Amino acid sequence: MLQTHIPVMLSEVLKVLDPKGGEFYLDCTFGAGGYSKAILESCDCYVVALDRDPNVIKKAEEIKQNYVERFDFIATNFADSFAKLKEKQFDGIVLDLGVSSMQLDVADRGFSFLHDGPLDMRMSGQGFSAEEFVNTLEEKEIADIIYKYGNESFSRRIAKSIVEYRKTARIDSTGKLAEIVRSSIGFRKGKIDPATKTFQAIRIYINDELGELERFLMNVKNILKKDGRLVVVSFHSLEDMIIKNFFKENSEKPVARSKYAKDDIIIDPNKWLRIITNKALAPSDKEIRLNIRARSAKLRTAKKIL
């Protein structure tokens, strides 16, 4: 059963996306459909949604029933979506790079250290699982991945504990892994759970989340219309750095000119973006109180000007 999902920074996303009737929007990470539904409700526009998680198809079908002519869903990850989109172009594109509540809250999905279940973490249900990760990789590789993708300073201690544990028993549940991590670095009441960074790192690695983001950005220009907006909500410093650098590398400030001029002057034809949010937006204190998972969110937006 799908759990209630609260779209992070929804009001901010709608404000910068600025949906208009008759326009087309791409929701790259459908999840429980929060962004797609809100965009459809905002005006008489059209939405195409993508997701590689087969568990969201039922929710997509529900939205399709209410918006038969204005909503379509494609079961794919966004990095591999270009061929399936068949040269469609969009007035706005939204990416929410976080793991959804419907994944975290279902124990059998194996994403959460708060709910004991099979150690899986695969968004698509296919490929290399988290259980295989902790039971087969060398200690150094485990440590390097936890450090790189989780920014975990105790990565080597955690990796050593994982390897020591698996000598006597297979690590096959989220509960086992969480306890191994907690016991290796200690648990202090009131602090963020010690297992947080390790679970995050393994999830990012298992699903190639950063690679998928980079592959998508390489081609996003082709599916974004002129004046279209790219809106990205990230939850990890590495994700945000990729987005920040991509915007910076592909954007250029306009030359100072008359306020009566209508068009932007482009010095370099390869600079096709205009950054809308010079500084990443963060969720309000109120939203964080209502949804603690929003605490690390950052929103960046840019507009296509070529």
Swiss-Prot record:
Record-listed S-adenosyl-L-methionine binding positions: G33, G34, Y35, D51, F82, D96, Q103
CDD domains xrefs: AdoMet_MTases
GO cellular component: cytoplasm
Keywords of the record: Cytoplasm, Methyltransferase, rRNA processing, S-adenosyl-L-methionine, Transferase
Domain of life: Bacteria
Residues forming coiled coils: none
GO MF annotations, alphabetized: rRNA (cytosine-N4-)-methyltransferase activity
Function, as annotated: Specifically methylates the N4 position of cytidine in position 1402 (C1402) of 16S rRNA.
Family annotation (NCBIfam families): 16S rRNA (cytosine(1402)-N(4))-methyltransferase RsmH (TIGR00006)
Family designation: Belongs to the methyltransferase superfamily. RsmH family.
Protein name per UniProt: Ribosomal RNA small subunit methyltransferase H
Organism whose genome encodes this protein: Rickettsia akari (strain Hartford)
Gene assigned in the entry: rsmH
